[in-house]
Every structure is written in structure tokens, then in C-alpha cells.
């Protein structure tokens, strides 16, 4: 086009201009096109998250992001989390998930054969290891999912028309699911939500109250419930028994429960941590009876320390169609591949490795049981001391005159308030003990739980934690040592609680706060003058006083810990006093709190009123100074106020009057004249500031004795001679101080005209003078012969 343009236009200058214009227009168009494309990309990528924009990220950046998400930011405070011990068996289990994703890419025929082999092998191995003959297996991620599928299977088995008529069949004859009162929390609600059943279909079977363990299902009461449901036209469908309850690891009487279920045609399902002991050579009869049940749920992941391993539900049923409808079996290869991590891990561990891990956990629990039996003030809640793999213990304190056998449950004749107070005190202390042990021995895997009857307890379940955390026998010994080291603190604190309550209630201005969740000596609140006792709202003035009180108490550097927080039932601030590790003088502690809080309140009132006092004083001073200035004008006259004339008059006749000043005394809150300051060249006030209020009792402490400690006169920590020496020094100090006070009093009472005694006299003269004063007789001069 450029050549044709040059041919048509003969003028070279005009042709050059056309060429340049064309290039310029092309540049502008290209620039506009690029701008529109970039704007279009921005609009398109504005809704796309940052990590997805662009052409993607490399693997290193992605793994770095995952690491940051796992471990958190560096600025965050590190939390004490349990680190799972992932060994080679753990890597094998994790490899199973990646290998399963790779296997799923095979062709259908190879995938079907491989998944069938993996599923059949794993099912056979688990049935042989845990003595469950001729069983089928269902692998699931959620532990409760297997039980929900079993309930569906039981419904299909008992209601033949359920597939056709659906829930209309259930409406005519409602099914009943029986769960123990010691079952895991939320299990019944989960089953009803999964099955679409109303909550009245659940029946909670109570535990024993008179004979046997209080965490075992009451079989006689169960039979009564079943008979009542049958009479009401209901269908007893399924019973969930425990081989190791979720709380304390107790096992139900599975043998008797199996007989009851066979009698009434009820499906028996067993779950619990004690099922792991079926792999051992010796198994208790109560757990061995679980092999005759209709189904059971196993959790080999925690038992063997295998991460990301599914739970397994073993069951016995002959109709494959019903199991398929219930969801226990599936034709999808992906569902069968759930068993791959467990299939790899079981082969890696072998039978010896599996038995060794379960046996090691049981030995740890037995070791802890035997050690805690020798520790005083520790009660062990164990069903069977020979085979129980779960240890539950709690701290207790025997009441004076009580039966040692009734450690956890107070006597029925005791008052309800005393029983509740004792229960809450022990619960708070056990909660503190459990948290301390978890921090000191993190490899133990302890958990703190609240039981309905026993209260707060500490649970050691090595079957669920030992393989994961790598717990050893040395960790158990360290745990026992930590328990023994905390017992003096617990016993001392519990003994001082009642004394602290009595002292606080007897002290004016202090209010004892009953907080059942506080494990320390107690909680106290100072009631200031403007405190509204009926209000539960936040009190700013009280919060300020308690904040100052907390600061003063912490400055004493005692062995006690003090904290400030809201009251248990309101938002008012309180002082929380922590655990006592030694014998504490409660009366001195309470008195110190009361006196210090009163001083802080008075100081705060003084500061609040200071602004108003100073303002009024300044106004009064201004008025007085203005009056003084007017009086000066009247005395000097008007002529002296004229600049030139006043200077001449002042030179011939100087003014003798002095300037009257005023000073404001903050201590007295009054105006005073400055004449005393300028005439006598002395600054000061005749008003003596008030003394700082102190406690009514002043306690002499021995050297090195911390605040709030009782007297060490009877202590074995100090030698007899040293303690006697310290006591004599204290008595001498008291006598000397008392003698000085007496001499000062006598000197003030003496007549002002009486001559002062000489500076130095012989001892005899002093004695004669003292005798003369005592007899109140005139002194007669001795003859020279007697001198």
C-alpha cells in the first residue's frame, strides 16, 4: 500500500507525511487494543482468588504453604499439642492413600480383581486376629457410621415390607434402640438423625446402682424395659453394649445380654476399647463373650498407632441383598479401596507386631494401677484389676470421722450443702491435677472427664494413645512421681479452704465468693462504700480497687498466686487465691487483703476529691488576693498608682507594707499565710499528715520467712539453737521498743519546771533516784561520815 501511495502521490513530502500519519494511527490503535485486553483480563481475574491467578505455582511454593498452614504463623504463641509418633508403619498407612488413588486409574477388570482381593484379605485377617469367625467387614471413616449401617440392616431384616412401604411400616410398629446410660455422648442422637427416626425410639438403659459396677448396664432393668415395650406394641430392634465404656472402660455383662437378645430377637452390637484385648492370648470372659455378638466395631488405627486408617465393623449376615441395600457392601471399587491402608499396615506389622503393641498398652495400665495403689489420697475406679486397659483415678480427702471406704461418695446423713461443697472442691482440685499432669507428662495422653457419680476424674487409656504418642514405662513412672509431688499442695489447699471461708465471713468489708470451678484456696471480693450488692453488672470502681489490690498482693512476693477475674455468677471483679504449697496463716492473709483494699479505696477517694478541693481552694485564694489588692490600693492612695508620680512618692516616702501571700495546703485542704515562710525562712506546715493505716496485728517474721507463713517455732527446717536465737532477738527488740516508749511517756509527764537529770551519773545514784521516785519521799543529804 505504501508503494501504491508513492506512485499516486508525486510530491515526496506529502507522501512522507501520509506514511508517518499511518504509522502513528497504527501505534495508537495497537496501544488502545492492548489496554482493552489488559482491562478485560483484570475484570476477568478480579473474581479469581490470588493463588489461582496466572499460570500456576510450583510444587515448592505449594508445599511451603501447606507447612505454614500446619504449623501456624511464627508470631503466634506455640501451643502444647501432642505430636503423633509416625514410624515406618505410619508411612505405610499414608502410602496406602496415595497408592489407592493410583490404583483407581487401572482398567475396570484389573481394578475389580485387585479391590476384591484387598477387601477379602483384610476381612479374613481381622476376623482371625480378633476371634470373630465367619464375619464380614465394613470399612468407614466415621466410627459411628458402621453402627448406623447395622441399624439399617436390622430394620430391613425385621421389617420385610420396609423396602416397599418405607416408614409407614415403622409407624405401625415403632422400633426401639436400647443404649446404655454409659454410652458415648451423642450416639443416640446421631443414630436417629442418620435413620430418620424420632427420639422416642431411643431407650436409655440405666446402669447398676446397688450391685456391680456403676458403669455397667443393669440387665434386670433391661428385661423389664423390653417387656414394657412389647406390651405397648413396639418392636425391640437393637441393643448397643460396651466392651469398655467411653468414660472409664468398664465392660457390660455381654454373656447375659446375648441371652436376653436371643430370647427377644434383638440385634446385639458391641463396641469399646477393650475389644483390642481379643488379639491377646489371655482374654477375660466378659470380653470374650463379645465374639458371639451380631456385630462389633473396631478402631485399629489408635490401637496400633496407624494414622488415617478407617474403622472396621464386623458383622454376621447371610443375605447379601440386604447388606447391599443397607450400604454395608458396595460394588464401587473406590469403596473397597478404603481397606488398602489397613491391608498394607497389617502385613507390615504382622501378628507379633500387632499383639506386641496391644500387650504393651495393657502393661502400661497395669503398671500405673500397681503404682497408684501405694499412693495415699488417690482412688482408682477399676472394674477388673487384672485385665482392665483403662485406669481412671481421682484425688480425694477423707472427712474427719468418715468411713475410709466411702471415699468418693459422702455419707447420706451429711447435709446437702456440705456434700455439694465437698464435691465441688474435689472436682476443681482434680481438674487442676489433671491439667498439671498433662503439661508435665505430655506423653501419657491423659484426659480429664466429669462423671455423674464420682465427679471429675483423670483417665489413662494407653490403648488409645500409647501407640500414637510412643508412651513408655518411664513415662508412667514419671506420671506417678508427679502425682506424689502434687499431693501436698492438694491436701494443704483443701484443708485451708474452710478456714479461709470462715475468716472472710468474719471480716468486715470482704465477701466470700463460692466458685466451684476454682481450685485454689478461695475467692474473695471487697465491698466498697458505693457497691450495689443487688446488681450483677460490671462495677468500674470495684474493678479499679481490685486491680490495685492485685498489684499490691503480687508485690509481697509470697508463695501464693493471685489473679483477678469476674465473679462466678456476675460480672463483678474478685481476687482468686491459688494453691497453697505450705502451711499458710489464713488470718494474716485475710487481714492483709482487707487492710490493703481499704487503703486503696481511701486513696482513690482522696484522688477523686483532690480536683474539687484544689479548684475551690484556688477560687478562695483568688478572692482573698483580690481583697488584699483592694486594701493595698486604699492604703497607698490613688496618686501612687500613676506611673511617674507614684515613683516620686515611693522615693520620698517608701511603702512599708509587705505583700501578703497565700499557700494552699493539700494535706489540710486549707489556705495558709506565707508569712511564716518569708519571715522565718522555713517551709512547712503545722498540720501533720495522717499516718498510713496498718493492720491491727503486726507480725514479726524470722529472717527469710515469706509473707503469710505461720510461725516457724515448731519447724524442723530450722535448727533448735538458731530458732531460739531468733526468738530471743525478737523478744529483745520488743522489750527495747517497749522501754523506749515508756521512757518517752515518763519524760512527757514530768513537770516542766523540774530540772533535767545530769547526763551521766554513777549506777548507784540512778538506783537511789529510782528508789526515791518509787517511795515518793523527800531525799535527805547523807552525812559526810557515810560518804
From Swiss-Prot:
Leading EC class: lyase
Protein name from the UniProt record: Pyridoxal-dependent decarboxylase domain-containing protein 1
Cofactor(s), by name: pyridoxal 5'-phosphate
Gene this chain is encoded by: PDXDC1
InterPro entries: GrpII_AminoAcid_Decarb (IPR050477), PDXDC1-like_2nd (IPR055103), PDXDC1-like_3rd (IPR055102), PyrdxlP-dep_de-COase (IPR002129), PyrdxlP-dep_Trfase (IPR015424), PyrdxlP-dep_Trfase_major (IPR015421)
PANTHER family per the UniProt record, alphabetical: PTHR42735, PYRIDOXAL-DEPENDENT DECARBOXYLASE DOMAIN-CONTAINING PROTEIN 1-RELATED
Family of this protein: Belongs to the group II decarboxylase family.
Gene Ontology CC annotations of this record: intracellular membrane-bounded organelle
Species annotation: Bos taurus (Bovine)
Keywords assigned: Decarboxylase, Lyase, Phosphoprotein, Pyridoxal phosphate
One Gene Ontology MF term: pyridoxal phosphate binding
Amino acid at each position: 500500500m505504501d508503494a501504491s501511495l508513492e506512485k499516486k502521490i508525486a510530491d515526496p513530502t506529502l507522501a512522507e507525511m501520509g506514511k508517518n500519519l499511518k504509522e502513528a494511527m497504527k501505534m495508537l490503535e495497537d496501544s488502545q487494543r492492548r489496554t482493552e485486553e489488559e482491562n478485560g483480563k483484570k475484570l476477568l481475574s478480579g473474581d479469581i482468588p490470588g493463588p489461582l491467578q496466572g499460570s500456576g505455582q510450583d510444587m515448592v511454593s505449594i508445599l511451603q504453604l501447606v507447612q505454614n498452614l500446619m504449623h501456624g504463623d511464627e508470631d503466634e504463641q506455640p501451643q502444647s499439642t501432642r505430636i503423633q509418633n509416625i514410624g515406618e508403619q505410619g508411612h505405610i498407612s499414608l502410602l496406602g492413600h496415595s497408592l489407592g488413588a493410583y490404583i483407581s486409574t487401572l482398567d475396570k477388570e484389573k481394578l475389580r480383581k485387585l479391590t476384591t482381593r484387598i477387601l477379602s484379605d483384610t476381612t479374613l485377617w481381622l476376623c482371625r486376629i480378633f476371634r470373630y469367625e465367619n464375619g464380614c467387614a465394613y470399612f468407614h471413616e466415621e466410627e459411628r457410621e458402621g453402627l448406623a449401617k447395622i441399624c439399617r440392616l436390622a430394620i430391613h431384616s425385621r421389617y420385610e415390607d420396609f423396602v416397599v412401604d418405607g416408614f409407614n411400616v415403622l409407624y405401625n410398629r415403632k422400633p426401639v434402640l436400647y443404649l446404655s446410660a454409659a454410652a458415648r455422648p451423642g450416639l443416640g442422637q446421631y443414630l436417629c438423625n442418620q435413620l430418620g427416626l424420632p427420639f422416642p425410639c431411643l431407650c436409655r438403659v440405666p446402669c447398676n446402682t446397688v450391685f456391680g459396677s456403676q458403669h455397667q448396664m443393669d440387665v434386670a432393668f433391661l428385661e423389664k424395659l423390653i417387656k414394657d415395650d412389647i406390651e405397648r406394641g413396639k418392636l425391640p430392634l437393637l441393643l448397643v453394649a460396651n466392651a469398655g465404656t467411653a468414660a472409664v472402660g468398664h465392660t457390660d455383662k455381654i454373656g447375659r445380654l446375648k441371652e436376653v437378645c436371643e430370647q427377644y430377637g434383638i440385634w446385639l452390637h458391641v463396641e469399646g476399647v477393650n475389644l483390642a484385648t481379643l488379639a491377646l492370648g489371655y482374654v477375660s470372659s466378659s470380653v470374650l463373650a463379645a465374639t458371639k455378638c451380631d456385630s462389633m466395631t473396631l478402631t485399629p488405627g489408635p490401637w496400633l498407632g496407624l494414622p488415617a486408617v478407617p474403622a472396621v465393623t464386623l458383622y454376621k449376615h447371610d443375605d447379601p441383598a440386604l447388606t447391599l441395600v443397607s450400604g454395608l457392601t458396595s460394588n464401587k471399587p473406590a469403596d473397597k479401596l478404603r481397606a488398602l491402608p489397613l491391608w498394607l499396615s497389617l502385613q507390615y506389622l504382622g501378628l507379633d507386631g500387632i499383639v506386641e503393641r496391644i500387650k504393651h498398652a495393657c502393661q502400661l495400665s497395669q503398671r500405673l494401677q500397681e503404682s497408684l495403689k501405694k499412693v495415699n489420697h488417690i482412688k482408682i475406679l477399676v472394674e477388673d484389676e487384672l485385665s482392665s486397659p483403662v485406669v481412671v483415678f481421682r484425688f480425694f480427702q477423707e472427712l474427719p470421722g468418715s468411713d475410709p471406704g466411702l471415699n468418693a461418695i459422702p455419707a447420706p446423713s451429711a447435709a446437702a450443702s456440705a456434700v455439694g461443697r465437698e464435691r465441688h472442691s474435689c472436682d476443681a482440685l482434680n481438674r487442676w491435677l489433671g491439667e498439671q499432669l498433662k503439661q508435665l507428662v505430655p506423653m501419657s495422653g491423659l484426659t480429664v472427664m466429669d462423671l455423674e457419680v464420682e465427679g471429675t476424674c483423670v483417665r489413662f487409656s494407653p490403648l488409645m494413645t500409647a501407640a500414637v504418642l510412643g508412651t513408655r514405662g518411664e513415662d508412667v513412672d514419671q506420671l506417678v512421681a508427679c502425682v506424689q509431688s502434687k499431693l501436698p499442695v492438694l491436701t494443704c489447699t483443701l484443708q485451708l479452704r474452710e478456714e479461709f471461708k470462715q475468716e472472710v465471713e468474719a471480716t468486715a468489708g470482704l465477701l466470700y465468693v463460692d466458685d466451684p470451678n476454682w481450685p485454689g484456696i478461695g475467692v474473695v471480693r471487697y465491698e466498697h462504700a458505693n457497691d450495689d450488692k443487688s446488681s450483677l453488672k460490671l462495677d468500674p470502681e470495684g474493678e479499679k480497687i481490685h486491680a490495685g489490690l492485685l498489684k499490691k498482693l503480687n508485690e509481697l512476693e509470697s508463695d501464693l498466686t493471685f489473679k483477678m477475674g469476674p465473679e462466678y455468677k456476675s460480672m463483678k471483679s474478685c481476687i482468686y487465691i491459688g494453691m497453697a504449697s505450705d502451711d499458710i496463716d489464713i488470718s494474716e492473709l485475710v487481714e492483709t487483703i482487707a487492710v490493703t483494699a481499704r487503703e486503696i479505696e481511701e486513696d482513690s477517694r482522696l484522688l477523686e476529691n483532690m480536683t474539687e478541693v484544689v479548684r475551690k481552694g484556688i477560687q478562695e485564694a483568688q478572692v482573698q488576693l483580690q481583697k488584699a489588692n483592694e486594701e493595698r490600693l486604699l492604703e497607698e492612695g490613688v496618686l501612687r498608682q500613676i506611673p511617674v508620680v507614684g515613683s516620686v512618692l515611693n522615693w520620698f516616702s517608701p511603702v512599708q507594707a509587705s505583700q501578703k501571700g497565700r499557700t494552699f495546703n493539700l494535706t489540710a485542704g486549707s489556705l495558709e499565710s506565707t508569712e511564716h515562710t518569708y519571715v522565718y525562712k522555713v517551709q512547712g506546715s503545722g498540720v501533720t499528715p495522717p499516718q498510713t493505716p496498718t493492720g491491727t496485728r503486726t507480725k514479726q517474721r524470722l529472717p527469710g520467712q515469706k509473707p503469710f507463713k505461720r510461725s516457724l517455732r515448731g519447724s524442723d527446717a530450722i535448727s533448735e539453737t538458731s530458732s531460739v536465737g531468733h526468738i530471743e532477738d525478737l523478744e529483745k527488740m520488743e522489750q527495747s521498743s517497749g522501754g523506749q516508749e515508756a521512757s518517752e511517756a515518763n519524760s512527757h509527764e514530768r513537770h516542766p519546771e523540774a530540772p533535767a537529770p545530769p547526763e551521766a551519773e554513777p549506777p548507784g545514784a540512778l538506783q537511789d533516784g529510782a528508789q526515791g521516785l518509787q517511795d515518793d519521799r523527800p531525799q535527805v543529804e547523807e552525812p559526810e561520815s557515810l560518804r
